[in-house]
Amino acid sequence: GLVERIGSKDAEIHYKSNHTKIDEVLDIPNHTVGLEKVVNFLLDEKVGVIKSTSEIEAVGHRVVHGGSTFSNTTVINQVVKDKIKKLFSLAPQHNPPNYEGIVVAESFFPNAKQIAVFDTAFHQTIPVEAYKYAIPTKFLVENNIRLYGFHGTSHKYVSEQAIAHLGIENSKIITIHLGNGCSMTAVKNGKSIDHTLGFGPVTGLIMGTRSGDIDHAIIFHLVNNLGYSLDEVNNMLQKESGMFGLTGYSDLRDIESEAEKGNKECQLALQMNAYRIKKYIGSYA
């Protein structure tokens, strides 16, 4: 199942079990209410799959940012929660709700193990020559700035499946995660050695609403010469750029459909997207 748009009066909950599928739009103001709805479905006499919450042995939590602290899937305790809180500044839009989800799950499933899976963990094997930025080292060290990478769970799974399917011992694989967020990873013998996303989730490939690589001089031009605030530029690069900025559509299915109808902007956007992907494949090969 899935709960979307938490914090909205038009939140959505999707539940599926056996031959039952339920989709509802309702007011879900916070994670507590959202998980309560999920638990109610799980326990429901007609569509539920458990009789008691004590049947749940473990709850998995996707945590976007583990910094340099977490390099593996981790059983959550108070020490782990405290460390996740210290990483809020590295992912202010993601780690706080991830943390809230952990706290709420602990209240509903007090006897279950809570497990954290970090998006950044798989990329902790990237060597220093690939993760370090060429800005003053003192600044990097004092502020924990480096390439962290994201979508690690996806890249780890895909690379493991590819290695198993191909049956090779010494492997060099390029994995590509394509969706609204996009990234590419160079994987050598099962370990991440380079990745297109960096300190944040904006660099690299062209994404649904994120810009991918741009010349950072553009940011200074927007702020210093055109009067944009840093918040406005950040919002532009995160939510108004990428395929959406080029075409007005963020979904590739819509863009492909429009391109087939002769929409020149959509055709060019697809060419740009393919070129960027090929460019990184070439650099990782």
Sequence positions of predicted segments:
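General beta-strand structural signal in soluble alpha/beta enzymes
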Residues: 61, 92-96, 113-118, 174-176, ...
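Adenine-nucleotide phosphate-binding core of ATP-dependent small-molecule kinases
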Residues: 235, 239-248, 252-285
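Glycine-rich phosphate-binding loop of actin/hexokinase-like ATP-binding domains
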Residues: 122-225
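Conserved active-site and cofactor/substrate-binding residues in soluble primary-metabolism enzymes
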Residues: 29-33, 75, 79, 96-100, ...
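N-terminal glycine/serine-rich phosphate-binding loop of ATP-dependent small-molecule kinases
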Residues: 1-67
